[in-house]
């Protein structure tokens, strides 16, 4: 029996290319075929949002010249329904509530690949 794996179309809004690669590798090591694009700032983000069909987005609170709040604003303005997971350094109940209230589908600690 054979079946094809579907690629997860992933957009990563991050300020570190190395850490973004680690995120992609964590998903691949978990058995998920992943096709990803990295947005290092707002210009990259807007090009990616306008030019691609994304299934999931991983986002840092700030990256380059942009922020999570800006990401959510662009998604709403462009009518994109992409689930966003916020990768938070300061993982507390307050940051979870704040991220979720701004529209994140989930909030995970930036350094915990198992929760991702």
Tell what function each PLM region has:
Residues 20, 42-45, 50-78, 88-95:
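Conserved phosphotransfer microenvironments
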Residues 7, 33, 53-55, 78-83:
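His-Asp phosphorelay/catalytic-motif detector in bacterial-type signaling
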Residues 1-37, 43, 50-51:
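Non-catalytic signal-transmission and effector/linker regions of two-component phosphorelay proteins
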Residues 94-95, 111-116:
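C-terminal output helix
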Residues 38-40, 88, 109:
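Short loop/edge segments at beta-strand edges and connector loops
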């Amino acid at each position: 029996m054979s079946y094809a794996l579907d690629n997860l179309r992933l957009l990563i809004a991050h300020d570190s290319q190395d850490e973004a690669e680690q995120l992609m590798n964590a998903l691949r090591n978990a058995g998920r075929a992943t096709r990803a694009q990295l947005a290092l700032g707002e210009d990259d983000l807007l090009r990616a949002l306008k030019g691609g069909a994304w299934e999931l987005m991983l986002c840092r609170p700030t990256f380059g010249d942009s922020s999570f709040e800006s990401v959510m604003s662009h998604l709403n303005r462009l009518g994109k329904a992409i689930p966003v997971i916020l990768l938070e350094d300061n993982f507390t109940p307050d940051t979870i509530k704040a991220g979720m209230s701004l529209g994140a589908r989930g909030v995970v600690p930036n350094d915990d690949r198992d929760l991702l």
